[in-house]
Amino acid sequence: MTQVFQGRSFLAEKDFTREEFEYLIDFAAHLKDLKKRGIPHHYLEGKNIALLFEKTSTRTRAAFTTAAIDLGAHPEYLGANDIQLGKKESTEDTAKVLGRMFDGIEFRGFSQRMVEELAEFSGVPVWNGLTDEWHPTQMLADYLTVKENFGKLEGLTLVYCGDGRNNVANSLLVAGTLLGVNVHIFSPKELFPAEDIVKLAEGYAKASGAHVLVTDNADEAVKGADVLYTDVWVSMGEEDKFEERVKLLKPYQVNMELVKKADNDNLIFLHCLPAFHDTNTVYGKDVAEKFGVEEMEVTDEVFRSKYARHFDQAENRMHTIKAVMAATLGNLFIPKV
């Protein structure tokens, strides 16, 4: 009998039910425990996994690679210079070729349509490692981290600070409300989430008992916050907008003043990384020299504070990605959830 996840792709949060998403989070926690105790879990023994990367990555590549190896699979990295998606070969043709050679495909790139075409034509599970619209594997790691810290998800309040229309904000809104988490977007009006994303999240919120708030008012945004979350001010492909974003988003920086507004000693801080919290990067130095800003979306004080959980969050990328690959490609018995 085919189990509920078998053969499915993982392209966007909206493709899964609340129960399915919760199952993947809990399954990831189980796999994390097995890893910590040194217990083998080779659910993908003999499988070959293609890792397609249009966009560069540290965490996503490392997480998929180690997760595949831990599961007994062989990962093969194909970077932007190795694949011809839509250039010399159509995505459809590439998908059909890769689907005959690999058992599963990860894609990290720009177009959501491209990852959907890979899933449509390859005949194997396809996992979205990030597109301009969605970042579903990040969400599993994020909400696993939240659950590890609070023991639950339902009824908590997560506040995202910064660019409210990027892929992380989209995914936090949809995944959070799906899971019963109140999601606040603290952003300038110019960068409020798209109306269709907000409406989608509001629909999930109505079903789960959560609520959605989109505001440019700091006091309103962080009231009752359990989680403060931020991301880089300039997404990949938007590097020419640094000056504009620095000026626009400086008031939305996560700093100790904002943390104190939440008035919650159990608050945690999350960041999907990389973070520009100092000048120890080329970008950091460049922004400091050009615009006089040494800390961008989060201050170094908060980044290194007792509230910070971003390195736990980064580790959880591996465990949650492992859960997705094992559930969709492994020959596991998973009853209907």
Swiss-Prot record:
Coiled-coil blocks: none
Species of the source: Streptococcus equi subsp. zooepidemicus (strain MGCS10565)
One term under GO cellular component: cytoplasm
Residues that bind carbamoyl phosphate: 57-60, 84, 108, 135-138, 272-273, 317
Protein EC: 2.1.3.3
Broad class of enzyme this protein falls into: transferase
Annotated signal peptide: none
PROSITE patterns noted in UniProt: CARBAMOYLTRANSFERASE (PS00097)
Pathway it works in: Amino-acid degradation; L-arginine degradation via ADI pathway; carbamoyl phosphate from L-arginine: step 2/2
Pfam families, per database record: OTCace, OTCace_N
Gene3D superfamilies cross-referenced by the UniProt entry: Aspartate/ornithine carbamoyltransferase
SUPFAM superfamilies membership: Aspartate/ornithine carbamoyltransferase
Gene Ontology terms for molecular function: amino acid binding; ornithine carbamoyltransferase activity
Keyword Zinc: no
GO biological process: arginine biosynthetic process via ornithine; arginine catabolic process to ornithine; citrulline biosynthetic process
UniProt entry keywords in alphabetical sequence: Arginine metabolism, Cytoplasm, Transferase
InterPro entries: Asp/Orn_carbamoyltranf_P-bd, Asp/Orn_carbamoylTrfase, Asp/Orn_carbamoylTrfase_sf, Asp_carbamoyltransf_Asp/Orn-bd, Orn/put_carbamltrans, OTCase_ArgI
Catalytic reactions of this protein: carbamoyl phosphate + L-ornithine = L-citrulline + phosphate + H(+)
Binding positions for L-ornithine per the UniProt entry: 167, 231, 235-236
Similarity comment: Belongs to the aspartate/ornithine carbamoyltransferase superfamily. OTCase family.
Predominant location category: cytoplasm
Function text: Reversibly catalyzes the transfer of the carbamoyl group from carbamoyl phosphate (CP) to the N(epsilon) atom of ornithine (ORN) to produce L-citrulline.
Keyword Cytoplasm belongs to the record: yes
Name of the protein described by the UniProt record: Ornithine carbamoyltransferase
Subcellular location: Cytoplasm
